[in-house]
Each structure stands twice: as C-alpha cells, then as structure tokens.
C-alpha cells in the first residue's frame, strides 16, 4: 500500500499493490489506511483507492472491502477500477451510502476528488 496525501488538501490517495489472500492481510491494509486518516488534522477526507492491481483478484478486493475498519472521517471514497465483487462487498457500508464513487482511471479520480472538495465538510 502506498498512501499519499495531496499537499494541503484532505485527499488521501492509496494504491493497493500485490495480492490479498486472507482477512488478516486485508484488515492490516485497511487499518493502516484508516490509522493514517484518523491521525490526520482533517475532520473529513476524500480517499482515492486505486484497486487496479486487484483486478485479477476479485476475492482480494472483496476481502479488502469487507474488512474496512469503521471511521466517520471518510466523506467520499473514490475507487479506481473496482472489481464488481468489491462493489457488492461495500454495500453494507451504510455510513458511506451515496459517498462511493467508481471511476476507471487516475485522471477521472482526480477530477472527481476536485469536484467533491468544495462540498467537503471540514
């Protein structure tokens, strides 16, 4: 996982690399992401989650979505190349309903985040 904050903006980009084979590994990745968010100075954030590398592993994407620790700081979650199984696995995340955005490229994700920034509650 490669987390990177946008300079002076409440936007965290996270690129998932490699394979996810079990719940513990998935939870470890998402916990690190949530810990970065919780320790930030921002009340609410936009997360750009690049799942391109998991395209070959829909079960890994589902494990990742199903093991996302709860945080109320994620205002919008923009996912790049999310497999269909990931979309199904995020359905129980009621606190993110209408805040999940699916895009096909980094440029689309950047545009979406820039469009959402003025609406962010901070």
Describe the function of each predicted region:
Residues 1-122:
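Amphipathic, Lys/Arg-enriched alpha-helical "gate/interface" segment within cytosolic domains
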């Amino acid at each position: 996982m490669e987390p990177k904050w946008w300079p002076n903006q409440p936007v965290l980009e996270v690129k998932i690399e490699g394979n996810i084979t079990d719940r513990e590994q998935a939870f470890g990745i998402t916990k690190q992401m949530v810990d970065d968010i919780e320790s930030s100075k921002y009340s609410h954030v936009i997360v750009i989650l690049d799942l391109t590398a998991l395209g070959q592993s829909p079960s890994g994407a589902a494990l990742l979505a199903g093991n996302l620790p709860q945080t109320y700081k994620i205002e919008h979650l923009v996912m790049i190349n999310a497999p269909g199984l990931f979309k199904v696995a995020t359905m129980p995340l009621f606190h993110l309903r209408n805040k999940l955005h699916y895009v096909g490229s980094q440029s689309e994700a950047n545009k979406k985040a820039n469009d959402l920034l003025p609406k962010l509650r901070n």
